[in-house]
C-alpha cells in the first residue's frame, strides 16, 4: 500500500488542465465497438485500471483490440461473434465492467464466469442479475446471484418492461444491452433519470432508442455499426480540480474539454448554488457528448441543501462536494444519497471518518451527511480505503490543511485518474 504526503499549498493552484477521458464513455466505447460490425477508433480513451479491465475481458472473448495510450482500435465481432472465454473474466475494481458486460453476456449462448477484486465481491449484483434472469438468462453466484463470482449462460431472451427501484445507469444499461438480442421491445423505467451515456452511444452506433420521460425503450434484433468515438474529459475527475480552484486561496484554473452531459453536471449546478466564481465555454456544439472549457477561481462559498432529482447527476462527486462544504459559510445538508453506501466503499462512512480526522465538523445521516462550515483543516494521516474518489478528495483537502497530510493507499486514484498527483504538483508551482 503506497502512501503520499501532501504539503499545504501556499500560493494557490494555477494553470490549465486537460482532464483525462470520461471513464463511463471509455468503457462503453470499447464494449459497443466489440459488439458492433466494423472497426471503431476511440480517441481520448481513459487508460485507467478500470477501462483496461474492460479491454482485457473483451480480448478474452476473441475481440481484436489495440490500445496505445489514449487511442484504441476495436475490430468488432458483431453481437453474435463473441467467443466463449477460456478463462474467468476478471473485472478488477470495475463495477461498470461487470454490470454492463453482464447484459451483453446475458444475450450470448455460451458459458462465462465473471469476478473482480475484494471490493467488487461486496457490491450488490442482484439489482442487475434479477432483471436479466427475468429475461431468460441463466445466472448464478454467491447468495443466489447477489455477489460475485457470477456464472452466466445466456441466449434466447424475451424483452421485459422493468421498473427499477434505483436510478442506476448500470442497471438500465445492462437491461438495454441484453435487450439488443431479446424478442420484443425492452423498456426500463427509473425513479429519477440516471446518466444516459448508453442511450447516446447506442444511437451513435445506429441503434434506435426511444425515450419517454423516465422510460427508455429499444426493440430487439438491432445491429450496431462501428463508428469513431471522441471521448470528452471526465466531469467526475474534473470535479476535484473545480473544488480545489474554488476553495484553495489564490487559485485560478482552466479545465479543458470537460464532458458536459446534462445527466452528469450536477456538480456544476451545486457550485453555482454555492456561489462559486466560474465560467463555462461550450466547445463542441452538436456532438453526441457535449464538452466545455471551465475557468474557476477562489470563491466565497455558502452552505446549501442537496437532494432529490439532482443526486444521480452528482453521486460520484459527493465526496469532493462534502469537502467544498467544509469551506462554505453555514450548513450543507446532503440527503437522498443512499447509493453512496454501495460504491467502492460506503462513501457516507468513509467521507465522514476521514474529513473528521482533518478537523472538519461533519456527521453521517442514513442517506447522506450534514456538514458545518467553515472549518480550519489540520493535516493528519488519512486513508483512501482503496477508493479512488476518496483518495483524490483527501489530496485536495491536504492542499488546504495546516501541516502535512499523509494519504494511505493513495495509488487507488489510478483507477480513474492515473496522472492525478503529477497534475496536482504541476499546478502548485
From Swiss-Prot:
Pathway: Metabolic intermediate biosynthesis; chorismate biosynthesis; chorismate from D-erythrose 4-phosphate and phosphoenolpyruvate: step 6/7. Keywords: Amino-acid biosynthesis, Aromatic amino acid biosynthesis, Cytoplasm, Transferase. Gene3D superfamilies: Enolpyruvate transferase domain. Its main location: cytoplasm. One of its GO terms (biological process) is aromatic amino acid family biosynthetic process. It comes from the Bacteria. It is an enzyme of class 2 (transferase). It is found in: Cytoplasm. GO terms for molecular function: 3-phosphoshikimate 1-carboxyvinyltransferase activity. Its EC number is 2.5.1.19. The keyword Transferase applies. It catalyses: 3-phosphoshikimate + phosphoenolpyruvate = 5-O-(1-carboxyvinyl)-3-phosphoshikimate + phosphate. Catalyzes the transfer of the enolpyruvyl moiety of phosphoenolpyruvate (PEP) to the 5-hydroxyl of shikimate-3-phosphate (S3P) to produce enolpyruvyl shikimate-3-phosphate and inorganic phosphate. PANTHER family: AROM/DEHYDROQUINATE SYNTHASE (PTHR21090), PENTAFUNCTIONAL AROM POLYPEPTIDE (PTHR21090:SF5). Monomer. NCBIfam families: aroA. Belongs to the EPSP synthase family. This is 3-phosphoshikimate 1-carboxyvinyltransferase. It comes from Bacillus cereus (strain AH187). The gene is aroA.
